[in-house]
Structure formats: structure tokens, C-alpha cells
Amino acid sequence: MAEDTSTEKRYLPIGSVVQLTGGEKRVMIYGRRQRQVDSEVLWDYIGCLYPEGNLSEEYMYLFDNEQIETVYFLGFQDQEEFAFQQRLIDAG
């Protein structure tokens, strides 16, 4: 099998469940390419605790691909998701 050597950034689909490096709980992704309001920093993802879900702003986590240690579940993917993935990639 050929190794994927592309430098194109890929995003996990909504609903993916991941473990962040140094994290104690798993996180479920519910948004991508999120801008932090108070600093204008652009993050790859926003997530909430799994299995608890979105409890409050206090429990929202902004993070990048590089911070993901393990992917436990890959979210739903269909043609609409693949088209949106391409829009995210094209946006840089």
C-alpha cells in the first residue's frame, strides 16, 4: 500500500471522538476551523467532553490536529461531508 505523502490538511468529521495528548477524558468534535473570539486564533476543532456532550462554555475545547493522540471513533461521512472537507481544504 502506498504511503500518503500529501501535505494537504485533512479534518476529522463531526462526531469523531478523540483523546487529546495529556487529556484525561475523550472529546467529541462538533466544529471545525473555529476562531477563538477573544484572540482571533484559528483552531482546527472545537469539541466537548464525551459522553457528557456540550455542558457549557466552560467545557468547550479548542484544539489542533497535532494535539490528537488517539482517534476512537470516526464521525459520519457521506458525499456532503466529502464536499465540505474539500471546501475546508481549499480555504487553507
Where are these regions (language model features)?
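Intrinsically disordered, low-complexity, charged/polar segments
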Residues: 48-92
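Residue-level marker of beta-strand positions
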Residues: 15-17, 26
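Mixed-charge, Lys/Arg-rich low-complexity intrinsically disordered regions
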Residues: 1-14
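Short beta-strand-centered aromatic/proline hotspots
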Residues: 25-35
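Short, solvent-exposed secondary-structure boundary/capping segments
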Residues: 35-45
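Canonical SH2 domain fold
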Residues: 31, 45-48
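Short, glycine/acidic-enriched capping/hinge loops at junctions between secondary-structure elements
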Residues: 29-31, 40, 59
